[in-house]
């Protein structure tokens, strides 16, 4: 039987270990800080110019995307993007086969616009995909009907509709279009958002978790970042976010491969 001081020592050790476990596994889920959602992002600081990202395949630049926010006087906010991608560099990707088979040269372009209410809910969005300089080959439109997001995919010879429940304030974006800021992160925080893939004509739920911290090199300088693990179905990707919420680098599954978006 332990002595009195041994019992005190064991109890103190147990209390310290329990406190560390609660801090690691419980507190991140109970903190009242805002989740990374449209409400938090639309209220964050808006940069005066769009953010430009390089699209990299094994460190080879194959395109770019610009993202930005517009805050309107009536309280609405718009998250917009414009993407240009060289499809020649991606021959063999099933997602682009229908565009490459047309023989149109030049860059593949995609524009998107997500309109957020003053309450931080996505109200509607528009996505257009252009092969080269032609008219849009694919149009995607989404409109919130109460708590149901009604999405339509329209292309030559194709008409497809999809409905799903929209979680209030939750994020939604387009494949290869990164969210440029994720404020109020902490290790252990989890959330979900949806990604629209107009080329595959699908929407996908992405599950995210801040798994730890890591020092990365960005603009030839070391930066302490949060590491966000993102699950796209069976595929896994990562995102590196500065402590102030700025996203520096993000992996994006594209077909069966992974591209990297680098904040310029």
Predicted regions span which residues?
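Acidic, serine/threonine-rich low-complexity disordered tracts
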Residues: 1-147, 155-164, 178-264
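Acidic, glycine-centered active-site loop in nucleotide-sugar glycosyltransferases
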Residues: 151
């Amino acid at each position: 039987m332990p002595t009195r001081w041994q019992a005190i020592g064991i109890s103190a050790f147990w209390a310290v270990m329990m406190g560390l476990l609660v801090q690691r596994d419980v507190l991140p889920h109970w903190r009242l800080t805002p989740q990374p959602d449209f409400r938090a992002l639309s209220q964050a600081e808006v940069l005066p110019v769009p953010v430009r990202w390089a699209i990299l395949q094994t460190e080879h630049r194959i395109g770019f995307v610009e993202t930005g926010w517009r805050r309107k006087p009536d309280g609405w906010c718009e998250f917009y993007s414009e993407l240009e991608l060289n499809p020649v560099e991606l021959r063999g990707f099933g997602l682009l086969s229908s565009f490459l088979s047309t023989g149109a040269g030049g860059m593949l372009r995609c524009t998107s616009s997500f309109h957020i209410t003053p309450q931080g809910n996505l109200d509607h969005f528009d996505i257009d995909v252009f092969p080269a300089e032609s008219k849009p080959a694919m149009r995607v439109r989404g409109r919130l009907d109460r708590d149901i997001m009604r999405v339509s995919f329209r292309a030559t010879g194709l008409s497809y509709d999809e409905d799903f429940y929209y979680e209030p304030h939750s994020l939604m974006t387009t494949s290869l279009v990164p969210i440029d800021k994720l404020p109020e992160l902490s290790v252990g925080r989890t959330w979900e958002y949806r990604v629209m893939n107009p080329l595959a004509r699908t929407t996908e739920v992405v599950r995210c978790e801040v798994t730890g911290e890591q020092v990365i090199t960005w603009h030839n300088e070391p930066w302490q970042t949060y590491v966000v693990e993102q699950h796209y179905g069976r595929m896994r990707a990562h995102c590196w976010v500065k402590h102030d919420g700025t996203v520096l680098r993000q992996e994006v599954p594209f077909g069966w491969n992974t591209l990297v978006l680098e904040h310029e």
